[in-house]
UniProtKB/Swiss-Prot annotation:
Family (UniProt): Belongs to the methyltransferase superfamily. RsmH family.
EC class of the enzyme, as a word: transferase
Domain of life the protein comes from: Bacteria
GO CC list: cytoplasm
Gene: rsmH
Positions of S-adenosyl-L-methionine binding: 33-35, 53, 80, 101, 108
Name of the protein this chain belongs to: Ribosomal RNA small subunit methyltransferase H
Length: 311
């Protein structure tokens, strides 16, 4: 299977994750297994990597590409949000590090029939796990106008959300919206031509919103990150790469909450909550890809890396 995927910020991931031989690590989003290979190489000869992916195609590719590492690699079909349960079933009670490279993969975008791209005609699908029900077409055709507008506004940060939702509801009266380019045409008609942005396709934000909703991406990130931080051993590190502000905000907020410690009101003379910091944040500001990497891999342009260490 042809599966093109170039790992984002590979050197930075290794720097902040700091994998070592004998350690137990989790890659919550295997994708093309680029990061996973680097972690397995860095933890040779006896480190273990548990890798998650809910995309059956990605998991198959990861198994093939990482077969040479034998039992040091444990592939898991499913969402990294289920990390706590899965690791307990594997008898793993703690990890030395984890990586979450969230969002849609290059392969998913480039595979037209998956329906993630607004540039090619395909079924309006957008499921990362094609074995479960619930496609983007289901949302577009079944949700009421208010709920559609909410999703597009909240997950896509689209200023024209209400107008787009209205146009979608009117268009589906003539028949179901089942193709990506059908939806693109509706979105283009909803956004006034003078409001189109020079470097951003008019459908970008709506497609992002539907993809996030179909795959519960933000909920998965919150649950998975909470679970991963709970499993992290003292001195262990967590690295998260996100690709838009909604994801980055979740990571930043959770890292800060774990690093805060005391949550007592400032007016109290002493701490009564007993809270202590559980994390040390390693990245005051998110790390971004360098110019050379962005030139070679445009997907890296919007990537933001945050890292923290368990206390």
């Amino acid at each position: 299977m042809t599966f093109s995927h170039r790992p984002v910020m590979p050197a930075e991931v290794l720097e902040y994750l700091s994998p070592r031989p004998g350690g137990v690590y989790v890659d919550g989003t295997l994708g093309g297994a680029g990061h996973a290979r680097l972690i397995l190489e860095a933890t040779s000869p006896d480190g273990m990597l548990i890798g998650f992916d809910r995309d059956p195609a990605a998991l198959e590719v990861a198994r093939e590409r990482l077969a040479l590492f034998g039992e040091r690699f444990r592939p898991v079909p499913g969402n990294f949000s289920e990390m706590g349960r899965v690791l307990a079933e594997l008898g793993v009670d703690g990890v030395d590090g984890f990586l979450l490279d969230v969002g849609v993969s290059s392969h998913q975008l480039d595979t037209a029939e998956r329906g993630f791209s607004f540039l090619t005609d395909a079924p309006l699908d957008m499921r990362m796990n094609t074995l479960v029900p619930g496609t983007a077409a289901d949302l577009v055709n079944d949700l009421n106008e208010h709920e559609l507008a909410r999703i597009i506004k909240e997950y896509g940060e689209e200023r024209w959300a209400r107008r787009i939702a209205s146009f979608i509801v009117k268009a589906r009266v003539d028949g179901p919206i089942e193709r990506t380019l059908q939806l693109v045409d509706i979105i283009k008609g909803a956004i006034p031509r003078g409001a189109w942005e020079e470097r951003i396709h008019p459908a970008t934000r709506t497609f992002q919103a539907l993809r996030i909703a179909v795959n519960d991406e933000l909920g998965s990130l919150e649950r998975g990150l909470e679970s991963a931080l709970g499993l992290l051993r003292p001195g262990g590190r967590g690295v998260v790469i996100s690709f838009h502000s909604l994801e980055d905000r979740i990571v930043k907020t959770m890292f800060r909450r774990y690093a805060q410690g005391c949550t007592c009101p400032k007016e109290l003379p002493r701490c009564v909550c007993g809270g202590v910091p559980r994390l040390r944040i390693l990245t005051g500001r998110p790390v971004v890809a360098g110019d050379v990497e962005v030139a070679e891999n445009p997907r890296a342009r919007s990537a933001k890396l945050r890292a923290a260490e368990k206390l």
